[in-house]
Swiss-Prot record:
Catalytic activities: (S)-4-hydroxy-2-oxopentanoate = acetaldehyde + pyruvate
Name of the coding gene: bphI-2
EC numbers: 4.1.3.39
Keywords on record: Aromatic hydrocarbons catabolism, Lyase, Manganese, Metal-binding
Organism whose genome encodes this protein: Mycolicibacterium smegmatis (strain ATCC 700084 / mc(2)155)
Protein name per its UniProtKB record: 4-hydroxy-2-oxovalerate aldolase 2
Annotated Mn(2+) binding sites: D21, H203, H205
Signal peptide (residue range): none
All copies of domain Pyruvate carboxyltransferase, residue ranges: 12-264
SUPFAM superfamilies reported for this sequence: Aldolase, post-HMGL domain-like
PROSITE patterns cross-referenced by the UniProt entry: PYR_CT
Length: 349
């Protein structure tokens, strides 16, 4: 069994997910050298945990999600060899990744297994948590699209994960759709349900511009683990920027062990040059937050927009109306064709 990696001087443990969530923004094209330089900079700044995987987790390199330029297991190995103090985490989605992928990631130096399911499907993670704990890995559970169910129902799903061996259950705002009290209420519900059985975490996105504020709400509600990405390097408008989170946490007295100036330097000088472009709160990203669309849909929507000549923001809005979730990216093609037919019908009148 693995204990939770948590220094007594911390109030919360930060995880930087630039090299996993950022993979969506980079269309999974990280090189080994980019991973090496980013991990070295984050490690030197005192970031406790760095997540490294394909954007959609172990085994995500595929036609549906996009192929990795460099095999993710190779990137995990490079990250683990580079980090001096930071622990390397990896994400897996049951049905995308396999138990064998978990074992290989551990062999390559990953020590924290983060297992993600849709927020109503925690039961599909039970065997994976069991294996991870048997292997001696620390475990984290992701309840994705947490805005779509009530705090009470989310807490029930968190209990399933905790009973299966999960050591920290995250409220995951995959769409960046939660607003302040929505985060507080969900985190409080999980804290009340789990007690000392498991910690509670929060993973935010910037699609409504609330990633940092929501993370502060989460900490005040009892969250002990918080995600972010340097320079907002993530899906949609990006994740809560770690460097801003550390600045805010310093000001309100929340201890993280991360040096503000070092993480600001890492974001500016190391992470930013590896980004294809800044993560923007543009119309497309804003629509995702407003309509509750899974953040990784952004690049897929842009691709179908270009292919079929229909506006990406309309694709995303309809995806929200259909309540699509991660794994249903292919339905954007159906929506594009639907809009295309409507355009042609309107033009023929």
């Amino acid at each position: 069994m693995s204990d939770i990696f948590f220094n007594p001087i911390w109030d919360v443990r930060m995880t930087d997910t630039s090299l996993r969530d950022g993979s969506h923004h980079k269309r999974h094209q990280f090189t080994g050298e980019e991973v090496r330089s980013i991990v070295a900079a984050l490690d030197a700044a005192g970031v406790p945990v760095i997540e490294v995987t394909h954007g959609d987790g172990l085994g995500g390199s595929s036609f549906n999600y996009g192929f990795s330029k460099t095999p993710e297991q190779e990137l995990i190995k490079i990250a683990a060899e580079t980090a001096k103090e930071s622990k390397i985490a990896f994400l897996m989605l049951p049905g995308v990744g396999t138990k064998e992928d978990i074992k290989e990631a551990q062999n390559n130096g990953g020590s924290i297994c983060r297992i993600a399911t849709h927020c109503t499907e925690a039961d599909v993670s039970i065997q994976h948590f069991g294996l991870a704990r048997e292997l001696g890995l620390e475990t984290v559970g992701f309840l994705m699209m947490a805005h779509t169910i009530s705090p009470e129902k989310l807490a029930q799903q968190a209990r399933i994960m905790a009973d299966a061996g999960c050591q920290c259950v995250y409220v995951v705002d995959s769409a960046g759709a939660l607003v302040l009290e929505g985060v507080r209420d969900r985190v409080q519900a999980l804290v009340a349900e789990l007690g000392s059985d498991a910690q509670v975490g929060f993973h935010g996105h910037e699609n409504l511009g609330l990633g940092v504020a929501n993370s502060v709400e989460a900490v005040r509600a009892g969250a002990k683990q918080i995600d972010g990405s340097c320079r907002r390097f993530g899906a949609g408008a990006g994740n809560a920027p770690v460097e801003a989170l550390i600045g805010v946490f310093d000001k309100i007295g929340v201890k993280t062990g991360i040096d503000f100036f070092d993480i600001a330097d890492a974001a500016e000088e190391v992470v930013a040059p590896a980004m294809p472009a800044e993560c923007l709160l543009d119309r497309n990203a804003l629509i995702m937050g407003y309509s509750g669309v899974y953040s990784s849909f952004l690049k897929h929507a842009i691709r179908q927009s270009e292919r079929y000549g229909v506006p990406a923001h309309q694709l995303l809005h309809r995806a929200g109306q259909r309540k699509l979730i991660g794994g249903q990216e292919d339905q954007l093609i159906d929506i594009a064709l639907e809009i295309k037919r409507e355009q042609e019908a309107a033009a023929s009148k």
